[in-house]
Amino acid sequence: MTRVADLIFARLADAGLSHAFVVTGGGAMFLNDALRREPRFRWTCHHHEQAAAMAAEGYARVAGRPAVVSVTSGPGGINALNGVWGAWTDSIPMIVVSGQVKRETCMSSYPGLHVRQLGDQEADIISLVRGITKYAASITDPRKAERHVEEAVRLATHGRKGPVSYTHLTLPTNREV
């Protein structure tokens, strides 16, 4: 059985994407592994998520096609926002894939619970990026993963170009397998 994380990078490669700018982390461990396994991708590790997002923006400007930013949950996704904002304002295509804590420890699973954070290193990144991306979704149903990836690539590369965050595609850790 194909893991959702493997499917994501396989479909991105099928769409012609070949470069990823990465900061690894526990909240994206299966995404990190899937990227390593996909032979059509070249990836560069960075020390900070902002640098990874800005490197992806620079790559897209030079290559004329989007790159992938892959970061971990919570602060990882938040740290990438300066680069996502830059891509948004300059209409630069970018696909951001971030990890997320287990669905059971996401605030979105408990709408009546009035706390700011539930899971360790959790952030509601989708709400944060919705205004600066063309598409933002959390893959909570593995059967819909392929559709999310296709939509993210389509929106990032057609019409007025811009970042998508699954594009932020977030993938809860327990949905990555």
Language-model segments: residues:
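N-terminal alpha/beta PP-like core and its mobile active-site loop of ThDP/TPP-dependent enzymes
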Residues: M1-L169
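Single conserved hydrophobic/aromatic residue that forms the stacking wall/gate
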Residues: H168-V177
